[in-house]
């Protein structure tokens, strides 16, 4: 009808990480194609098991006058909503309704940051977390390799044998779930590591698969390969130091502390000192 604004066509894609689906809605077909390529392997096909996403975000693409990606991220909880901001994006998310919006330019980095933040907030309520850690599956078991930048996450990933499946070389996704006992007699509470599309120096997406976590290794470079046990208190402190955490929220700080305590009482933690040689993998497992 004359006088009515033309309806804008909308495009959607569901990106599922760690079994949590996020639907991204946009009016830009080119941006949609970029997301489908960027998150290949984590995009849920129509009718897939996670096609009914847990959360919806509408993306408003516009030149961002305040664009400065070097500005630190801010995540604040106010009136039931999470307000997220960095130099290159602004976003808002209401957990009660599962809906939110993102204002950014047409780039993959801003929405990648929002996804990381949202997943950390979701996992904090469930006893899980995202971790500065490489992770891989071997013989049906997942191993985490945590450390600060330069500790060797990418190196240990490059050295992985052919029978290992890389989940990530940068950000590990850990969920607290019921897992089947080894003897098949039932299930027990445990931790499962999932592949992520969050990449480090390898610039390679992890495999979209998962396995129970068998051990966490705290990385350190040295003159020889060695594995040393870590006390529960030290393990908890170092685990907390490597968790992704963005929010200025006391309740979530408590949740993260509890998640770290629960994890180190359930999963063995070791310090892995290594030289950049593939033989280090003979000591893992």
Residue ranges and their predicted role:
Residues 156:
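Hydrophobic positions on the alpha1 helix immediately C-terminal to the Walker A/P-loop
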Residues 151-153:
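Conserved glycine(s) of the Walker
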């Amino acid at each position: 009808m004359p006088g009515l604004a033309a309806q804008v066509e909308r495009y959607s894609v569901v990106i599922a990480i760690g079994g949590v689906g996020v639907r991204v809605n946009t009016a830009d077909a080119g941006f949609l194609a970029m997301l489908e390529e960027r998150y290949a392997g984590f995009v849920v096909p129509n009718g897939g098991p996670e096609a009914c996403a847990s959360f919806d975000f509408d993306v408003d693409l516009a030149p961002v006058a305040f664009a400065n990606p070097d500005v630190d991220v801010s995540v604040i909880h106010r009136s039931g909503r999470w307000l997220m901001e960095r130099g290159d994006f602004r976003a808002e998310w209401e957990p009660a309704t599962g809906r939110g919006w993102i204002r950014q330019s047409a780039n993959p980095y801003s929405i990648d940051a929002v996804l990381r933040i949202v997943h950390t907030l979701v996992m904090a309520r469930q006893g899980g977390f995202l971790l500065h850690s490489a992770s891989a599956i071997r013989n049906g078991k997942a191993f985490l390799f945590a450390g600060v930048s330069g500790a060797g996450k990418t190196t240990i990933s490059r050295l992985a044998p052919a029978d290992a499946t890389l989940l990530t070389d940068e950000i590990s996704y850990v969920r607290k779930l019921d897992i089947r006992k080894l003897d098949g007699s039932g299930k027990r509470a445990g931790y499962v590591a999932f592949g992520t599309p969050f990449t480090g120096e390898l610039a390679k997406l992890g495999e979209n698969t998962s396995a129970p976590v068998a051990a966490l290794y705290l990385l350190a470079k040295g003159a020889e390969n060695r594995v040393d046990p870590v006390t529960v208190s030290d393990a908890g402190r170092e685990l907390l130091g490597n968790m992704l955490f963005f929010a200025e929220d006391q309740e979530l700080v408590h949740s993260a502390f509890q998640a770290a305590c629960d994890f180190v009482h359930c999963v063995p933690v070791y310090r892995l000192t290594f030289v950049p040689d593939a033989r280090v993998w003979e000591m893992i497992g």
